[in-house]
Regions:
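Primarily EF-hand calcium-binding motifs
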Residues: 60-62
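Terminal recognition/anchoring or ligand-binding modules at protein termini
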Residues: 12-34, 38-46, 64-147
């Protein structure tokens, strides 16, 4: 847990929002988009979830606008986190321009996600933050992608 707070502090996310995400039974699009948008410097740490969603949509990192309180399936959590680093995927990742399905499979193959996890499952905020820090540990030797 200390590693989570330390790594997230590097990206200046609001402690209040991080606490809220940690206590979420099921993480939402707004929460995940906030993490991704603040990590890339697209929004300030006091930005709303709606602003984070909008900026990721405007930057082409999301295909559509979603409702901030809509639960996000794990496959889309991994896809949004993949926007932070240049994850070297296999052939299908490259052929599909890093489609969410193949990014999810790549993270499983890399050992970032447990093999028992289902792509359509909803995960807690605690799990999403743990996944975020695992990605940071695994892929974090690279610079963050900022477009």
């Amino acid at each position: 847990l200390l590693f989570i707070f330390t790594s997230l502090r590097l990206f200046s996310q609001s402690n209040e929002k991080i606490s809220s995400i940690l206590s979420s039974e099921k993480v939402t699009y707004g929460e995940v988009c906030y993490l991704v948008a603040t990590a890339q410097g697209f929004v300030d740490d006091d930005a709303s979830y709606e602003q984070a969603i909008q900026v990721l949509y405007d930057k082409g990192q999301m295909k559509s606008i979603v409702y901030k309180n809509e639960y996000i399936p794990l496959v889309n959590v991994t896809f949004l986190f993949s926007q932070l680093w240049d994850i070297k995927g296999g052939l299908m990742c490259r052929l599909t321009n890093n489609s969410p399905r193949y990014v999810f499979k790549q993270l499983k193959s890399d050992g970032v996600i447990e093999s028992s996890k289902d792509s359509s499952s909803f995960v807690s905020g605690r799990y999403a933050l743990s996944l975020y820090t695992t990605c940071l540990y695994y892929y974090g030797n690279q610079e963050l992608k900022v477009e």
